[in-house]
Each structure stands twice: as structure tokens, then as C-alpha cells.
Amino acid sequence: MKRFVTLTALVVCAASAEAAPETYVIDNSRTSSQFSYRYLGLANQTQRFEKISGTMVFDPATQSGSADVTIDATSVNTGQALLNAQMRAADFFDTANYPVITFKSGKMILSGEQSSLSGELTIKGVTRPVTLAVTHFQCMQDSSLQAETCGAQASVTVRRSDFNMGKFPFLVSNDITLNLAFKAVKAQSYMQVASRDSGR
């Protein structure tokens, strides 16, 4: 009887461990963050941020989770030094006072085309509730990294004026679309992957 109880406990523990939520660390070198807007009411322009960090928790049993993402606003890159400076200035991101953009999500729902991340987006010290549309979410063993990874694309359209960035509406559209294409590495393996990358 004692042996049966012990075996049962081991099976339950193994099942719990298998279904437990896993933490993944965003790999900046394999992640991109962009924002696009309409310039002069004509063509769309797309710019990017070079530095993104954060974590994601994913529960495969319930197909749900959460995310905590930080974008270094000072890393904005338009390909032009003058425009970079304008983007960092007080009229736009004001990186001297607000060097980071954050997104904290406590609710991730994965359901085909209805997949989403709901949470709070903070830009320039202003926090607003947003829901990001999520596509191409997949977790898998990445043979090139020798680690389990999760990746997806997420996007949301916000209004600049909601974040104290509404100046020059005749130049830049009020609507801005944020796009994030990320790859995250399981936390237990992240340092090994980062160490191999730095040694290249």
C-alpha cells in the first residue's frame, strides 16, 4: 500500500511538473520592435527600436500566460541621426525623462486568429490599457540554439495624443502601429545561449 501511494505521488508530481507554467527570456538579438505611422498624410514610414528585454510566462496546459516587456526608447533608430534626435526629444518620446517603454500583460489568450495579449502600455510616463493581436505563436525546440524557445508576432495601434505625443499632427499621423516580433528562450537555457552568442 505504501509503495502504491508513493508511486501515485510520483505520477502526480510528474504530471504537475509537466503542466507547470514555464518562464522564457526575450532574446534581443532575435527580436525586433518597430513602429509605423503615416507621414504627411501620404506614405507610411516605419522606424525601429534596437533594444528590447523582458520575460514571458507560458502555461501549455491552459494555453495562457503573461508577458513583461521593456523597450529602450533611447535605442530608436530611423537611419538618420537628425531624426533620431527629434524622436528622442521632448515633443516625442522625451527619452531624457522617460528612457523606457513598458508593456505588462497579465492575460494572454491563445485561440487561433483570436489570440491576444491584454495589459498596460506605458509611454512617456502615461499608462493605458491595450490589447495586442498575436499571430504565429509557437513554442518549439530550436536545434540551432539547443534550447526550447517561444516566438510570435504582436501588434497594436495606439494614438500618440493619448501618450502626450500629439504634436505636429500635420506631419505625423495620430495613429501609430507598434509591431513586435520576438523570440524568447526558456529561462534555464538563456544564459548558455547568451554566452554562446557573445563568444561568436
How would you name each of these model-derived features?
Residues T8-V11, S111:
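Compositionally biased amphipathic helical and low-complexity segments enriched in hydrophobic
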